[in-house]
Regions:
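General nucleic-acid-binding
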Residues: 1-37
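A short, Lys/Arg-rich alpha-helix, primarily the initiator
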Residues: 23-56, 134-148
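The alpha-helix within a helix-turn-helix
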Residues: 50, 61, 91
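Short alpha-helical DNA-recognition segment
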Residues: 54-73
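Helix N-cap / loop-to-helix initiation motif
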Residues: 56, 67, 83, 95-100, ...
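Short, basic-rich loop-to-helix N-cap that marks the start of a DNA-contacting helix
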Residues: 78-93
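Short C-terminal boundary/hinge segments that cap the last helix of small helical domains
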Residues: 96-110
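Helix-turn-helix/homeodomain-like alpha-helical modules used for DNA recognition
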Residues: 107-148
Length: 148
């Protein structure tokens, strides 16, 4: 799978040792440059999206059926990554567009898959701007999938 266009690895080519400078130093410098391009973590992105929507934390996690202690882990640890089901629940609770949902999932290291019934169902509801968790759970259950 190709890297996104904005992820430029062309500068990461190892250089031959010249004038006593090791290729490791060159690679480290190039990796440092890439580290300066880091995107938001899942936690940072989620908290920003909650704020942008004018929601309180408790409104967001309650609507996503996430308990307070679990949300506290997300809030306190900038690098914490919940499971995919939790991320999907937040995409619905925050009433994200399909593109926003894909971005939030990607920030946690996940993607919507066409081989997953749950993903197909959630994507359908997001694409059609239907954010009723009860309705989504009914359809998930009808297709034998775990509910939120």
């Amino acid at each position: 799978e190709a890297l996104p266009e904005e992820f430029d690895v062309s500068t990461m080519q190892k250089t031959k040792i010249q004038k006593g400078m090791s290729s490791t130093m060159s690679v480290n410098r190039n990796i440092d440059n890439l580290m300066n391009q880091l995107e938001e973590t899942f936690s940072q992105r989620l908290l920003r999206m909650i704020d942008e929507r004018g929601m309180t934390d408790s409104e967001a996690y309650t609507k996503a059926y996430v308990d307070r202690r679990h949300f506290s882990k997300i809030r306190k640890d900038v690098n914490y990554v919940p499971n995919k089901k939790t991320v999907l629940a937040f995409t619905i609770a925050l009433e994200l567009s399909l593109d926003e949902a894909k971005d939030l999932l990607a920030s946690a290291g996940f993607a919507l898959s066409r081989s997953s019934k749950t993903d197909i169902i959630v994507a359908y509801f997001l694409q059609n701007k239907i954010y009723d968790m009860f309705e989504i759970n009914d359809v998930l259950d009808a297709y034998g999938q775990p509910v939120f």
